[in-house]
Amino acid sequence: MTSEKSQVLFPGAAPQVTTDLSNNVVLTTVNDLYNWAKMSSLWPLLYGTACCFIEFAAMLGSRFDFDRFGLLPRSSPRTADLIITAGTVTMKMAPALVKLYQQMAEPKYVIAMGACTISGGMFSSDSYTAVRGVDKLIPVDVYIPGCPPRPEAIMDAIVKLRKKIAAEDMRERGRLQQTHRYYTVKHNLKPVPEIITGKYLESETRQAPPPELAAAIGLPVPPALQTADFKQAEQQLKALQGGV
């Protein structure tokens, strides 16, 4: 009686996976192996600008165990593949955020955390410096609404990002083009002149003292200021005479 190991299979039959082979060999594809390695070792770049980052700091403690997802916080964008934006993004900070994103290695992912990051939050109605959504600057993969969102919501976002990475295909990477960029013509940001030019003390209003101060310390008052003061005094006198 022959054992199963020494049994000779008929070569004309359909190929079958024996029990010994299925118990000792893992069958997969390069694409699945690549996605498994990516989603199991995400290295986030922590980008916190406001109070939402306090909730994210709770993830680093032992209660929520940030490391069980394989996440290793990085301080340099060149070694990170995930950026978590938490807090308000201002017009002045927008170019720095875009530069950090550009320095990250491909493939890279973005998680927008909090209402201020997603839509501007409470600053979206009357603020002239808040960016109304970080997706106007960089492409966002997962949104976390809340003001601020709880650590459990952050964990759920990480799980959703891992599922998204697991469903990716290496052959479609060329189609995933980034459409939202700070320097393109598609954005709705309006260029404004710089406020701090370094020439504030060199301006004419700062070089010459006020006429009241110049007259008090004995400095000569410019004729233009004297004429303006005379006309103003004459108008005040006419107003008083008309009232009488």
Swiss-Prot record:
Residues that span the membrane, as ranges: none
GO molecular function: 4 iron, 4 sulfur cluster binding; iron ion binding; NADH dehydrogenase (ubiquinone) activity; quinone binding
Pfam families from the UniProt entry: Oxidored_q6
Disulphide linkage map: none
Cofactor(s) required, per the database record: [4Fe-4S] cluster
Keyword NADP: yes
Keyword field: 4Fe-4S, Iron, Iron-sulfur, Membrane, Metal-binding, NAD, NADP, Plastoquinone, Quinone, Thylakoid, Translocase, Transport
Binding site for [4Fe-4S] cluster: C51, C52, C116, C147
GO BP annotations, alphabetical order: aerobic respiration; electron transport coupled proton transport; photosynthesis, light reaction
Topology versus the membrane: Peripheral membrane protein
Domain of life assignment: Bacteria
Catalytic activity: a plastoquinone + NADH + (n+1) H(+)(in) = a plastoquinol + NAD(+) + n H(+)(out); a plastoquinone + NADPH + (n+1) H(+)(in) = a plastoquinol + NADP(+) + n H(+)(out)
A single Gene Ontology CC term: plasma membrane-derived thylakoid membrane
Keyword set includes Membrane: yes
EC number: 7.1.1.-
Compartments where located: Cellular thylakoid membrane
Free-text remark on how the cofactor is bound: Binds 1 [4Fe-4S] cluster.
Purpose of the protein: NDH-1 shuttles electrons from an unknown electron donor, via FMN and iron-sulfur (Fe-S) centers, to quinones in the respiratory and/or the photosynthetic chain. The immediate electron acceptor for the enzyme in this species is believed to be plastoquinone. Couples the redox reaction to proton translocation, and thus conserves the redox energy in a proton gradient. Cyanobacterial NDH-1 also plays a role in inorganic carbon-concentration.
Subunit structure and binding partners: NDH-1 can be composed of about 15 different subunits; different subcomplexes with different compositions have been identified which probably have different functions.
Family: Belongs to the complex I 20 kDa subunit family.
NCBIfam families membership: nuoB_fam, PRK06411.1
Name of the protein described by the UniProt record: NAD(P)H-quinone oxidoreductase subunit K
Organism: Synechococcus sp. (strain JA-2-3B'a(2-13))
Lineage of the organism: Bacteria, Bacillati, Cyanobacteriota, Cyanophyceae, Synechococcales
Gene that this polypeptide is encoded by: ndhK
